[in-house]
Amino acid sequence: MKKPLLLTLLCMILAGCDNPKSLESFTPEMASFSNEFDFDPLRGPVKDFSQTLMSENGEVAKQVTGTLSQEGCFDTLELHDLENNTELALVLDANYYRDAQTLEKKVQLQGKCQLAALPSAGVTWETDDNGFVVSATGKEMKVEYRYDSEGYPLGKTTINSQNTLSVTAKPSADPRKKLDYTAVSRVDDRQVGNVTLSCEYDAYANPVDCRLVIVDESVKPAVSHHYTIKNRIDYY
C-alpha cells in the first residue's frame, strides 16, 4: 500500500482529518444558560440558533431561540413552552437582561455576561473559578450543578425542605457526540425517570437532529414519551 493512501485511511479512522473544525469546549455562559433555561448546549462560534421539540404526533411542544455576540454572550433569548403554557423573552442591556416586551429588568449579570441574580424570585447564582454557574440559591431551595472537563453539564441536584431531586447525565464516550447521553432522575433514593438522547451532528460537533425518549417511572407501568428535536444553527 502506498504511503499517501495509508495516511488517508488513517485520517479517516481517526475521524478528523477531513473535518477542519477543531473541537471546542462549552463556554461558561452557554453551559450555564442551558442549565437554567433548559436547552441543549452548543459549542463553537454560534451566531444564532433555534431548538424545536416536537411530539411524536408532530406537534411543537417547546421552542428556544437565541442570538449571541462574537464574545459568546447571549444578546437575546426566547423560550416558548407550549406544554406548560409559559414563555420568556430576554434582551441584553448592559448588566441586565430585560423583558423584551415590558423592558423590565429581569436578570442581573456578573462578569462578562454571566447569570448573577433573579431579584423578583430572590434567586442568586454562584460561579466557580472558571466562570461556570455551580449553584443557585433561593428562599426555599438550592440547586447545585456539575460539569465535565469540557464544560458539558452533567446534571444537577435540587434540595428543598421536602426532598432532594437529582438528575445525573452520562454523555457518550465519543467527544464529538456529547449530546448522545442517558440521564437518570431520582427523588431522594428513588428513581423516578430516565432520558435517552441520540443525535446527528454538524462539523462543529453540535446536534442537528435528535431523538429523545423520556420514561416516567413514577407511575406503574412506566410510560414512555417520544420526541424529536430539530436544531437550526448559524455561525460567525
From Swiss-Prot:
GO cellular component terms listed in the entry, alphabetical order: plasma membrane
N-palmitoyl cysteine lipid modification positions: 17
InterPro entries: UPF0257
Keywords: Cell membrane, Lipoprotein, Membrane, Palmitate, Signal
Residues with a covalently attached lipid (S-diacylglycerol cysteine): 17
Pfam family, one: UPF0257
Span of the signal peptide: 1-16
Membrane association type: Lipid-anchor
Compartment(s) where it occurs, according to its Swiss-Prot or TrEMBL record: Cell membrane
HAMAP family noted in UniProt: UPF0257 (MF_01065)
UniProt record similarity statement: Belongs to the UPF0257 family.
Protein name (Swiss-Prot/TrEMBL): UPF0257 lipoprotein YnfC
Native species: Salmonella paratyphi C (strain RKS4594)
